[in-house]
Amino acid sequence: MKEELLKSWKSRSRENIKKYKIFLNRIDKAKAIRILPVLHQEAFKKINCLDCAACCKNYSPRFKQQDIKRIAKSLNMKERDFELTYLVSDEDHDFVLQSKPCPFLEKDNKCQIYDVRPSDCHRFPYTDEDVFIKQPALTLMNASFCPAVNEVLEKLMEIK
């Protein structure tokens, strides 16, 4: 994705958040959920996450116990040491990263732990899941920094 495209979606996102919110509250949820996988595929034909990595720079995934176990093992760390080194408990008592950007994000926007990354990272930005429609607050938050979310929302709005 070119730099001008990144700037364009950021501008559109800020302008359209209110419109997206109204749309997500009125949408035919069942119909939208059925077409999300196609829109997801189309969006990721245009968008390369490595051009952006805004999710890794602005967002912390939740680290479930299975994630912690898997990642700690891959780093040859004890689970508790991994937690103490990288994680904190948030207001919902979920483990999240202590800092942003993600400490596993490399300079070229690749992930050091990609093969064992947390399930939230694997699923992000949820554009092919019912969560995208059923949790509009999450979708709107993600729209503030993810071009794929904006792309899927724009295409959904065209279909109605």
Describe the role of every protein-language-model region.
Residues 1-160:
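Short loop/turn segments that flank or connect secondary-structure elements
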